[in-house]
């Protein structure tokens, strides 16, 4: 059975994007690093910011691509090749429009659902056989509003809900790392 060796937090690089809904994946790995007293360092060769942590006695690389969302797969594939990490050993944390704020879901494989970061990862890895932690940000209501919505900051109440979902996901991280997925899915997917 595989174990997670890389956690990718999707988002856009730069202060202007740091607090936007599209960066909730980055918030997730930043919280993991903070909880483990680790900081990120820039790795220009691998097109990302990296931190290394130990979770339940497993060495895990935290990756924040510095390629912007639409080309995240470049960094993910470079890091995976460098550390010899298989797609099944990767967890990607990302924003999810189709899930309400405050909720979080775990998924193995699946399509990109219009998410350009996932689309890029699928293309660069040549597969969608990796785990995804889908952090709910809610939907603005109409397709035409999506781009502005994901690139804007959440309200204070919504930010609190998203932070709560991130904390909830981190509570199950040991089991996710060790591929004990069924009990995690049951707990996360049950209201």
UniProtKB/Swiss-Prot annotation:
Give compartment(s).
Cytoplasm
Its chief place of residence is cytoplasm
**Any Pfam family the entry gives:** Pept_tRNA_hydro
Q: What is its EC number?
A: 3.1.1.29
Going by the entry's taxonomy, the superkingdom of the source organism is recorded as Bacteria
Establish whether keyword tRNA-binding is in the entry.
yes
Chain sites annotated for binding tRNA: 17, 68, 70, 116
**Gene3D superfamilies to which the protein is assigned, alphabetical:** Peptidyl-tRNA hydrolase
Family as reported in the entry's similarity comment: Belongs to the PTH family.
Recorded protein name is Peptidyl-tRNA hydrolase
State the organism of origin. Francisella tularensis subsp. holarctica (strain LVS)
The uppermost taxa in this organism's lineage are:
Bacteria, Pseudomonadati, Pseudomonadota, Gammaproteobacteria, Thiotrichales
């Amino acid at each position: 059975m595989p174990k997670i060796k890389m956690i990718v937090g999707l988002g856009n690089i730069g202060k202007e994007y740091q607090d936007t809904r599209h960066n909730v994946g980055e918030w997730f790995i930043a919280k993991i690093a903070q909880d483990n007293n680790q900081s990120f360092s820039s790795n220009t060769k691998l097109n990302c910011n990296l931190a290394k942590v130990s979770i339940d006695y497993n060495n895990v690389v935290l990756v924040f691509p510095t390629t912007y969302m639409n080309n995240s797969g470049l960094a993910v594939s470079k890091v995976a090749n460098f550390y010899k990490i298989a797609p099944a050993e990767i967890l990607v944390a990302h924003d999810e429009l189709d899930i309400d704020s405050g909720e979080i879901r775990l998924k193995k494989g699946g399509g990109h659902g219009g998410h350009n970061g996932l689309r890029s990862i699928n293309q660069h890895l040549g597969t969608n056989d990796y785990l995804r932690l889908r952090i709910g940000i809610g939907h603005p209501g109409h397709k035409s509003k999506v781009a502005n919505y994901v690139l804007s900051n959440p309200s204070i109440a919504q930010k609190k809900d998203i932070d709560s979902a991130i904390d909830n996901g981190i509570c199950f991280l040991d089991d996710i790392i060790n591929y004990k997925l069924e009990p995690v899915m049951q707990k996360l997917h049950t209201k």
